[in-house]
Swiss-Prot record:
PROSITE patterns for the chain: RIBOSOMAL_S26E (PS00733)
Residue ranges, annotated region (Disordered): 85-115
Protein origin, superkingdom: Eukaryota
Ranges of biased composition (kind: Basic and acidic residues): 87-97
Function: Component of the small ribosomal subunit. The ribosome is a large ribonucleoprotein complex responsible for the synthesis of proteins in the cell.
Protein name in UniProt: Small ribosomal subunit protein eS26
Subunit structure, interactors included: Component of the 40S small ribosomal subunit.
UniProt record, GO biological process: cytoplasmic translation
Organism, scientific name: Cricetus cricetus
Length: 115
């Protein structure tokens, strides 16, 4: 029978079993290696309130903390929420990650400061 994908839609190679995780969206059980993972870094405070909080802060150079979340989606939720989309037979073989989204007016990120 023909195969749709070289990796059968998952990252399990020599392992017999992979522990299941729950989809963030619908709570369906999905094998951890098959789940579509999305790492999100957001400010805890929404963009509209950042200036108000920084002005009200006692500390002048206080950096607002960020929220680091790894979202796990089942295949159907990832397609529905447009995290991934179905691709043609030839495009499926392309393993390069999609280009990183940067807003048009954003400056390139400065290099990290040495400690």
């Amino acid at each position: 029978m023909t195969k749709k994908r070289r990796n059968n839609g998952r990252a399990k190679k020599g392992r017999g079993h992979v522990q299941p995780i729950r989809c963030t969206n619908c709570a369906r059980c999905v094998p951890k290696d098959k789940a579509i993972k999305k790492f999100v870094i957001r400010n805890i405070v929404e963009a509209a309130a950042v200036r108000d909080i920084s002005e009200a802060s006692v500390f002048d150079a206080y950096v607002l903390p960020k929220l680091y979340v790894e979202l796990h989606y089942c295949v159907s939720c990832a397609i529905h929420s447009k995290v991934v989309r179905n691709r043609s037979r030839e495009a499926r073989k392309d393993r390069t990650p999609p280009p990183r989204f940067r807003p048009a007016g954003a400056a390139p990120r400065p290099p990290p400061k040495p400690m």
